[in-house]
């Protein structure tokens, strides 16, 4: 059984044996399974976005649990960029582990100030700006009871286009937050990645 993420193997009760190496082909046929490396070997180009966003939190990437990596990044973010606040709020769902790590490290309470509609997909891949903006409106809704009058820190995993961030900040202000601060758990995405 082969899968792109370890969590798929967990779900069916399979055991993770090893990762498929960059450029490797695993051939499974009537004679069994064999590995071939038909391409010139190059240095691996690990995509940091696997830890930040793409992988499911319950997967293992390069021997490390994605959830724990994201939570540790949030803790580091709190150490580097602390601000006095009343509440730490994740941008769901991908911002949750980093926000938990931020809250634990800072000692500021964690709460769900944004409720996510799980029937709306990834907003940053919509082909038009209007589509992205409309998707954000459908995907997230404020929880005014949690944020009204509070100084909040929003924690998200990344910013690709900024559409979600702008809308979420406005949403929190409209819900009555006294202050809205944004913390991002990864460096800015400024250029495309050509490594796949």
Where are these regions (language model features)?
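PRPP-associated nucleotide enzymes
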Residues: 1-196
């Amino acid at each position: 059984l082969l899968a792109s993420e370890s969590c798929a193997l967990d779900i069916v009760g399979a055991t993770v044996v090893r990762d498929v190496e960059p450029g490797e082909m695993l051939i499974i046929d009537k004679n069994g399974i064999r590995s071939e490396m038909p391409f010139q070997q190059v240095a691996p180009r690990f995509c940091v976005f696997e830890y930040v966003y793409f992988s499911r939190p319950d997967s293992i990437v390069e021997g490390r649990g994605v959830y724990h990596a994201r939570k540790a990044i949030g803790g580091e973010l709190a150490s580097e960029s602390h601000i006095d606040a009343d509440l730490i709020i994740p941008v769901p769902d991908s911002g949750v582990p980093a926000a938990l790590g931020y809250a634990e490290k800072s000692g500021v309470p964690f709460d769900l100030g944004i409720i996510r509609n799980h029937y709306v997909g990834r907003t940053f891949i919509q082909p038009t700006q209007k589509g992205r903006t409309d998707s954000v409106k459908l995907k997230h809704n404020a929880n005014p009871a949690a944020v009204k009058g509070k100084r909040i820190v929003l924690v998200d995993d990344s910013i690709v286009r900024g559409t979600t961030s702008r809308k979420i900040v406005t949403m929190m202000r409209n819900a009555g937050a006294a202050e809205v601060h944004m913390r991002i758990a990864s460096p800015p995405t400024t250029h495309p990645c050509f490594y796949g």
